[in-house]
Amino acid sequence: MTSRSSLPRWPTLNLERRSDGRVCGIDEAGCAPLAGPVVAAAVVLPPGPKPTALRGLTDSKLLSAEKREDFFRRIQDIAQVGVGMASVEEIDTLNIHHADLLAMKRAFEALPASPDHALVDGRSKPALGCNVEAIVKGDRRSLSIAAASVVAKVTRDRMMRELAGRFPDYGWHTNVGYGTDAHYLGLLRKGPTEHHRRSFAPVNTIFSPMATAWQRFRFEPVQDAASADGLDLFFLRNDLYAVFDRRGRHIGLVKNLRGCWTFRAIGYHDGGKPETGTGPFSRYDGMRVEAPQAQMVIRLLSTG
């Protein structure tokens, strides 16, 4: 196991040079999101010293979107690249762990020539036709794995942003399928799409065949006099609750921000899209709540 203190400042080719023959790095993107496929990439860098074109390359999560796009183009120019993915249906059927391994195997098989050795980020080893070494925090240690992490991340992000044009209510253009507040609200308002992972919470809890609570929720402008009486909180995440009035109309969120529970007002205007900081209880936006409990929120919103 690799400790953080032992990580090099930048990924190197030291692990690649320990092995004879051709070496590829493999990494994935998209294990945690609520929607979209999991994508893996396999990268074989050219032999010789560290390419100057990849100076500054590291784990894709530590790079800006602009840097990732730049390195993506550079990697495509100098390296052999294979990309594989596992669909939402495969994720739900196999589970995310086995779907992840399947995507890695497909990425490996998509390379133009089979490597002799594979360095894989993490602890799990996909079944490949060569020697496989799992490297904890490999995207911080191996340049090949870092390159694969960028290719996988950019490929998947592009896919999700394209889907956002067809499904604009979930914030995929920015969250690329991860469980942000906007994504959760989109699920409540519009329900899951064909691209959502039905085996993942909250999709498999809120929208299970036995669950009906969400059907009474309304996402519309509140035209009448607002009242805090009879408010209801609906659990979304450990740090996030949706707040509805007694008629089932959505009026806000209770969110844990830096250890403090906070009320965020939400209003609905033309087109039915939510807007934070507006709505009938906008004057309370950003105020603290003692706990994520209906009575605590009622107490806050009933103050003068």
Predicted regions and their residues:
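RNase H-like, Mg2+-dependent phosphodiesterase core
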Residues: 1-218
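Intrinsically disordered, low-complexity regulatory segments enriched in Ser/Thr/Pro
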Residues: 252-282
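Ampiphathic alpha-helical segments that act as solvent-exposed interaction surfaces
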Residues: 275-304
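Hydrophobic residues embedded in beta-strands of well-ordered beta-sheets
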Residues: 27, 240-242, 261-262
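Residue-level recognition of conserved beta-strand positions in structured domain cores
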Residues: 44, 85, 245, 256, ...
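Solvent-exposed strand-loop boundary residues in beta-sheet-rich modules
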Residues: 48, 247, 267-271
